[in-house]
């Protein structure tokens, strides 16, 4: 049996960020994820004709300074967020899209 001082449950944005910080600090950890992919609610799905549909965590604004800093540190490029036009917003899976 393997033991660890730190167990991270879930490989969404928070779990992956914690794992990254522990890795940088040279601390051992175990990261568990129930799904066959990482990212949690961050996911780009595609319609039947191939159009991208963002599922969860779709906005990255200038006020998200910590996340922007992390993305920069990791070499992940960002792009201008579209704020005009039409969008479908689903506040919860329990309520209809608006």
Locate predicted features.
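FAD-dinucleotide binding site
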Residues: 1-98
């Amino acid at each position: 049996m393997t033991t660890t001082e730190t167990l991270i449950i879930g490989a969404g944005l928070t779990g992956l960020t914690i794992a990254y910080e522990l890795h940088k600090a040279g601390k051992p950890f175990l990261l568990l994820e129930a799904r066959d992919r990482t990212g949690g609610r961050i996911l780009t799905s595609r319609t039947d004709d191939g159009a991208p549909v963002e599922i969860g965590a779709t906005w990255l604004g200038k006020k998200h300074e910590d996340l922007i800093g992390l993305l920069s540190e990791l070499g992940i490029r960002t792009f201008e967020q579209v704020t005009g036009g039409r969008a479908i917003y689903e506040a919860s899976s329990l309520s209809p899209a608006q």
